[in-house]
């Protein structure tokens, strides 16, 4: 099987606005990939899959480059003073865990950023991870009822984001807002079979079975999310950043659901989208520096 992995989540590939990335620094540019265990990365109906059963071959890095004439490069170098500053999006990750029966949980994230723009939260059944007979990346709602982000006791959003476990209209709308897609008519969303309101997919509260879940919730933190010229996320440098979650067995519209609190031991994956500055000064060290 041939697989293509677009490097869309790496800072050099997510400059804002889109810019070419200088490849003439005095230090080598390296791409490091860490592979998961085979039992986590793959799903199989038969147990016993080992890393040695998987072979990866024909690996190549394909990228687009522009080579400038020496005179043009000299003009650009003169205009910039030999210093190239680029603003980029970058993802950071934190993890936590909740045990079955939990009704409230607070996770300290340690996110450090001058402009934290978005936070996304997912729950995975811990027993699924590393089990080739289960979907390791299956996401469940875990009976989540509401959540907020606390930065030095300031709450984002000001009102908790509610999860009703039935239609999840607020979760879906906030997810689209965080993706800058709620008002974008060029983005399509599926609300029909296997879509957002399908109980056995997006709304599944217990993803320990063979049917994978797709629940994901996110919060937009930028004041001017529609502009690529204004960086208006929240400042979390030297701040205590915590995720506050509540779980219960009654949805916010009063409809009872089948399971009390968190149904399984779950692993939380929290992703933060932040803005970083990458700087290359060819008149000094000639190596890249990253500022958060």
Residue ranges and their predicted role:
Residues 1-292:
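Flexible assembly/topogenesis modules
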């Amino acid at each position: 099987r041939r697989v293509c992995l677009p490097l869309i989540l790496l800072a050099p590939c997510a400059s804002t606005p889109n810019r070419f990335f200088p490849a003439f620094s005095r230090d080598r540019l390296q791409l490091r990939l860490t592979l998961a265990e085979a039992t986590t990365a793959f799903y199989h109906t038969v147990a016993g899959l080992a890393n040695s059963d998987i072979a990866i071959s024909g690996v190549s890095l394909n990228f687009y480059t522009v080579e400038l004439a020496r005179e043009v490069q000299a003009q650009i170098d003169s205009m910039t003073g030999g210093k190239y500053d680029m603003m980029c999006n970058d993802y950071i990750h934190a993890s936590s865990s909740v045990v079955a029966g939990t009704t409230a949980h607070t996770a300290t994230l340690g996110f450090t950023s001058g402009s934290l723009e978005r936070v996304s939260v997912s729950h995975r059944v811990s027993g699924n991870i590393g089990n080739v007979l289960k979907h390791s990346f299956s996401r469940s709602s875990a009976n989540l009822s509401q959540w907020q982000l606390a930065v030095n006791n300031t709450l984002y959003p000001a009102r908790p984001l509610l999860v009703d476990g039935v239609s999840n209209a607020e979760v879906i709308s906030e997810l689209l807002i965080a993706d800058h897609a709620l008002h974008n008519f060029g983005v399509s969303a599926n609300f029909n079979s296997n879509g957002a309101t399908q109980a056995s997919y997006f709304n599944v509260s217990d993803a320990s079975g063979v049917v994978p879940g797709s629940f994901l919730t996110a919060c937009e933190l930028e004041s001017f999310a529609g502009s690529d010229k204004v960086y208006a996320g929240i400042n979390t440098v030297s701040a205590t950043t915590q995720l506050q979650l509540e779980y219960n067995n009654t949805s916010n519209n009063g409809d009872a659901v089948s399971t009390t609190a968190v149904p399984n031991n779950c692993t939380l994956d929290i992703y933060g989208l932040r803005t970083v500055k990458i700087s290359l000064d060819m008149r000094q060290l000639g190596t890249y520096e990253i500022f958060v």
